[in-house]
Amino acid sequence: MKKQNLIDMEGTVTESLPNATFRACLDNGCQVLTHISGRMRRSYIRILPGDRVRVELSPYDLTKGRIIYRLRSRHTNNSQ
């Protein structure tokens, strides 16, 4: 269940840090420290630098966030 007062933004993962923590650059240019949500941990979704992600931010601390979704890449490999 999503909380009402969270800010939802998109960005790109720039760096992978220990303990499922990542540094991401949001579309507005801000750098945030993010971690993976519990649902993504349970589903074993891998996040790599360069992936597009959707991040939830608290209005009280805009430097930390939670990755809630990994967006699909636009590039498709047709040479199966």
Curated annotation (Swiss-Prot):
GO MF annotation terms: ribosome binding; rRNA binding; translation initiation factor activity
Domain S1-like: 1-72
Keyword Magnesium recorded: no
Main location: plastid
Annotated InterPro entries: NA-bd_OB-fold, RNA-binding_domain_S1_IF1, TIF_IF1
SUPFAM superfamilies on file: Nucleic acid-binding proteins
Keyword line: Chloroplast, Initiation factor, Plastid, Protein biosynthesis, RNA-binding, rRNA-binding
GO CC aspect terms: chloroplast; cytosol
Domain of life of the native organism: Eukaryota
Function: One of the essential components for the initiation of protein synthesis. Stabilizes the binding of IF-2 and IF-3 on the 30S subunit to which N-formylmethionyl-tRNA(fMet) subsequently binds. Helps modulate mRNA selection, yielding the 30S pre-initiation complex (PIC). Upon addition of the 50S ribosomal subunit IF-1, IF-2 and IF-3 are released leaving the mature 70S translation initiation complex.
Family according to the record: Belongs to the IF-1 family.
Protein name (Swiss-Prot/TrEMBL): Translation initiation factor IF-1, chloroplastic
